Regions:
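Extracytoplasmic/periplasmic solute-binding protein
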Residues: 36, 40-46, 51, 77-130, ...
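Extracytoplasmic/periplasmic substrate-recognition and gating elements
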Residues: 39, 63, 191-256
């Protein structure tokens, strides 16, 4: 079975076979891709994904810029503001695709974008999870959200009904330059051409962010049921080992499923967005961890999402977002953990 991260593991850890002595665990490229319960290895990630701000190189160049001009939030804002001001001349509807808060799209902002202030708070405090988020970087969250909804293809009041498909259509229709999403979205945007796709880190105005890379992690971890028979456990371990070491298994995962797997025998992906993600790492940029797997509940995400939507529509204040983020976290953590 699978879990999505530490929060999921907390519910299922009693059923997790210890993988620390398995051949599968020995094939991992980094220990950071394993979830532990004390000394036991309870779960192992089997697919690594990356997200950031996908951009259309052709449109960015037409506006007079390249990726080299964008090294932090201030640069991103300057470029986006300029594109927005010249949108008629450039033939676009906005710098950014619509930040849709319909259920097909809101996860990009209440989860993936919200990861950034959490990541920087954890980093500053030297922690990996918390029962009470402080909201140290919520002013930074505000400025990137303000940029997304201001330099956009649509009026912020319309975001509640804007969908994931709307954003894809705007981006592939060359009506927007920037689109926050991840490596998994390649199939949706491939019509623009591989050479025309670039990816930027999500800058939120934090000191030293010129060294920041893309957001890389996993929400997909294999667990083996310790209540199964020994024969079934061994058969499962043998199969998973075959998946990540054999030519047929690694080909199926890379080519048929489009996965980047965190194992030594992994095949290279043909997805150009994954190539870009790998280049950031090769260039020594610091990847942003996926800390959203420590968010206390789905209810917490929904509270943040509702507050973001109301703020964008002008019916709510930013303070409501802060309350949903900070007070909501403490409340939901307590409900989940007692």
């Amino acid at each position: 079975f699978q879990v999505n991260g530490p929060v999921g593991l907390a519910n299922w850890k009693d059923y997790c076979y210890d993988l620390s002595g398995s051949q599968l665990y020995g094939e991992l490229t980094s220990d950071s891709f394993a979830l532990k319960d004390g000394d036991a290895v309870a779960a192992i990630a089997y697919v690594i994904e990356t997200y950031g701000i996908i951009y259309n190189k052709e449109l960015l160049t037409a506006a007079g810029y390249t990726q080299d001009d964008i090294k932090g939030f201030d640069d991103l804002k300057k470029v986006a503001d300029d594109i927005q001001a010249r949108k008629a001349e450039l033939g676009v509807d906005g710098a950014f695709t619509s930040a849709g808060m319909d259920g097909s799209s809101d996860w990009r902002f209440k989860t993936h974008l919200a990861n950034l202030p959490i990541y920087y708070e954890y980093k500053a405090d030297g922690i990996g999870s918390t029962d009470a988020i402080k909201g140290t970087y919520l002013d930074n969250y505000k400025q990137i959200w303000d940029l997304y909804i201001t330099d956009s293809t649509c009026d912020p009041k319309l975001l509640a009904s804007k969908t994931g498909n709307d954003a894809v259509a705007e981006f592939t229709g060359k009506k927007a330059v920037f689109y926050q999403n991840g490596t998994w979205a390649y199939g949706d945007v491939s019509s623009l051409g591989d050479d025309n796709l670039g990816m930027l880190p999500i800058y939120i105005g934090v000191e030293g962010e010129e060294n920041q890379g893309l957001c890389t992690g996993s929400e997909n971890f294999w667990c083996v049921n310790n209540a199964a028979s020994e024969a079934d456990i061994q058969a499962t371990l043998d199969f998973l080992y075959w998946c990540v070491t054999s030519d047929k298994g690694t080909s199926a995962m890379a080519d048929d499923m489009g996965f980047v797997i965190p194992f030594k025998a992994a095949k290279d992906s043909t997805n150009p967005l994954i190539g870009i993600a790998n280049q950031y790492v090769a260039d020594g940029k610091t990847s942003v961890d996926w800390c959203f797997s420590t968010m206390p509940s789905e209810e917490w995400k929904n509270g943040v999402g509702s507050a973001l939507t109301a703020y964008a529509a002008g019916t709510g204040k930013w303070d409501d977002v802060v309350t949903a983020f900070v007070d909501g976290w403490a409340k939901e953590y307590k409900l989940a953990n007692g």
